[in-house]
Amino acid sequence: MLPKFRSRSSIIKNTERISNILSGGKLTVCGSKLGGLYTFEKCTFNKYYSSSQYQHTGRPVGGNIHSSSNQQRQKNSEAPRINEIPPSTSSVEKSTTIPNSSVVLDHLLNEGENTLEEVKPSEIHPHMSWSSKSEGKMFKIPEELLNKLNGFGALEKQKKSFSFFTSASLLHRKITTELVNVLQRSKDQGTKDGRFLLDGAPGSGRSIALIQAELFALSQPNFIVLPVHNCEGWVNSTSSYGYDEQLKLWVQPDLIKGFLTSVMKTNSDKLKKLKTFESHELLQNECIPAGTDLLSFLHKLIASSNAPKSLEIFLQELNNNTKSNSNMKVLLVIDNISILSVVTKYKDKKNNFLPPKDFYFINLLFKYISGSLTFNRGTVLAATSSQPRVSTPSLDIALGVAHRNPYKSSDETILDSLQSVHILNMEPYTLDESRRMMEYLVSSNVCLEKVDNYLQNHVLSGGNPRKFFDACTRLA
């Protein structure tokens, strides 16, 4: 039995829900009417059973699908029993019944009481709120901030999951509130006492938590965000590099300029309000005077040929703007410290793989993580990652999840840098968070199950956000 719909708009709405899930599939809705009820005239699905095309051609008789192909039905004992239309009353073309096609319809449309569950649209708040009272609510990412996140690569890992939805929205979790409290702590507290590392199981939501921290900072008038995402690009030997005799470190000029460019574009409206404290000579014939706005200053630094010097000068001037007489703060975000803790794919002149500490930019990041370099006011927020999967023995020892092997060497830079970092462990979804996410997925037509199945999916996934999403969308 197919479900009975009271209006043409109702049937179209529900067929759209299914066609969205069955990529490549199509439902054609007839306009025939009997007793105020609409029925399917032709349905074509071609995802679940790619070897065949399943078609049903029927007439509106109480919502049933009828077929005149009795022989085909007898050849397939697995096919569901379908009522026969007497030849004298058939007013449609001869139909073909393909095995299991009704099973697909029954599974999608006819489960339980032969009706699709009507779920009210999940409430998505258009304006982000950062108080603890917002926990358990879905918030839409404003378009302006979404473009900034895309601009510095924060959404690379999320593109697949976000592609399911018409707009990008995030669940305000308990960890979200914790991170906001971290960023809002004492106005005079610098990064020396504000170094935090998010750790957790694969799929626990570390990158999403970092994004929410960045969204908060970007929405505030007194935060400069320094985003370091897609850290694999700093170690996979895909960019130019060279040895700097003065620094005694390897330098990646193109990547450094790319980082400075993303900082400039992300914070342009705030940088133009800040001024340089000192004059700087970039070239022999060019001197940038004190009092130059940081946006213009950074633009000239990017155009210069000395990338390491440009980065050093900019960070120095940015720190000058976070002194006690200013309300400006800095948020340094490092997504995937794991990949920065293992040997890179770059090689030296002797064809040996280079450790990350031998690179100027990576070495600089670990100085901020360790607290040997600081901003007067701000936060350093990093996260471990399981993508790509690499063995991180030194990082595991630093995090206390592995014991030091006296017969194997460890990276002392990693161990020292994380010695006094505050570890924030990612927790699984609570039951309330699972239900809220399930409501959002169902109302967005991404999940075909009933909302009440959130308990089952919570158990199957162990509350792991990524596994929960996969469990809810397994029919999609």
UniProtKB/Swiss-Prot annotation:
GO CC terms: mitochondrial small ribosomal subunit; mitochondrion
Pfam families assigned to the protein according to its UniProt record, in alphabetical order: DAP3 (PF10236)
Keyword check for Flavoprotein: no
BP terms from Gene Ontology: mitochondrial translation
Molecular function GO terms recorded: ATP binding; structural constituent of ribosome
Chain residue ranges for the region called Disordered: 58-97
Subcellular location: Mitochondrion
Biased composition (Polar residues): 65-74, 86-97
UniProt signal peptide: none
Residues engaged in binding ATP: G200, A201, P202, G203, S204, G205, R206, S207
Keywords: ATP-binding, Mitochondrion, Nucleotide-binding, Ribonucleoprotein, Ribosomal protein, Transit peptide
Matches recorded under InterPro entries: Ribosomal_mS29, Ribosomal_mS29_fun
Domain of life of the source: Eukaryota
The organelle targeting sequence, given as a residue range: 1-54
Subunit structure: Component of the mitochondrial small ribosomal subunit (mt-SSU). Mature yeast 74S mitochondrial ribosomes consist of a small (37S) and a large (54S) subunit. The 37S small subunit contains a 15S ribosomal RNA (15S mt-rRNA) and at least 32 different proteins. The 54S large subunit contains a 21S rRNA (21S mt-rRNA) and at least 45 different proteins.
Primary role: Component of the mitochondrial ribosome (mitoribosome), a dedicated translation machinery responsible for the synthesis of mitochondrial genome-encoded proteins, including at least some of the essential transmembrane subunits of the mitochondrial respiratory chain. The mitoribosomes are attached to the mitochondrial inner membrane and translation products are cotranslationally integrated into the membrane. mS29 binds GTP and is probably an active GTPase. GTP hydrolysis may be linked to subunit association.
Family: Belongs to the mitochondrion-specific ribosomal protein mS29 family.
Name of the protein in question: Small ribosomal subunit protein mS29
Species per Swiss-Prot/TrEMBL record: Schizosaccharomyces pombe (strain 972 / ATCC 24843) (Fission yeast)
